[in-house]
């Protein structure tokens, strides 16, 4: 029983230390490292999203309302054919 308690406490201790090491991050970045990290994120799409503005296009805006029902799907049985 004592052996199991020691093993269990050792496992829990290493799991605690491991979780602290995994969740930690460096605290003091130097100016060189900050510039490197900033340039890294500027090249990614996240930097592009943050710097982008509204699109100049119309998007999905419906221009002519009388044409809206032309694209309605007519449900019903499918035409008979060879199938799959």
Curated annotation (Swiss-Prot):
Organism domain of life: Eukaryota
Residues in the signal sequence: 1-24
Post-translational modifications: Contains 4-hydroxyproline; hydroxylated on Pro-77 and Pro-79.
GO cellular component terms, A-Z: apoplast
UniProt modified residues of type 4-hydroxyproline: 77, 79
InterPro entries named among the record's database cross-references: PIP2/PIPL1
Basic and acidic residues: bias regions: 58-70
Keyword annotations from UniProtKB, A to Z: Apoplast, Hydroxylation, Secreted, Signal
Keyword Amino-acid biosynthesis recorded: no
Major place of residence: secreted
UniProt-annotated location(s): Secreted, Extracellular space, Apoplast
Any GO BP annotation: innate immune response
Positions of region (Disordered): 50-84
Function summary: Endogenous secreted peptide that acts as elicitor of immune response and positive regulator of defense response. Amplifies the immune response triggered by flg22, the active epitope of bacterial flagellin. Acts as a negative regulator of root growth.
Protein name: PAMP-induced secreted peptide 2
Species for this entry: Arabidopsis thaliana (Mouse-ear cress)
Gene it is expressed from: PIP2
